[in-house]
């Protein structure tokens, strides 16, 4: 039997639409990003759900009533965007062989951070998203990039911040995922190495890319960068 998949954070699709409307593509939230996240992940809206049908008899991977929350990290450096091909051993199998413009990861129970409110400890979802993004970034860059600048394993300086949301209901993969987009600005991109799931990594000018080579979210990110809508 294949390795078990950890449950991941989901939000009801109806709630996503209540908060974000009929978003198709990228939406920057700028100064209201935190407030939008707070509304999206309000008390009672979020739940951790199985992705492992073989073990539980249910998988959110095919449940279009739920959106899996993905931290989607786009790496930029020297005016170029990291693109890569999804290797057969990594990530969403329905996207293998296509080029991507972001490192995407599920939010798992181990990422949950807490805050104190009304006399009790409750999940702090913005911090939880940051923890998930941090873990994904460290895993995919072999520990070279981490959020904590004092970490002795971090060999390259960078900044990382959430810049908006990405959604695409045009295919089966997109209908069960919602991306929280983080932009990672790397000072020395040429020194980065990546995990084995990241194949044929290149730093490329978004203006020169062939959109037909990219999966759905990748196309959206490239188009958004070309339009200057991610600052």
Report each predicted region and the residues it spans.
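N-terminal leader/linker segments that precede catalytic domains of diphosphate-processing enzymes
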Residues: 1-192, 198, 204-231
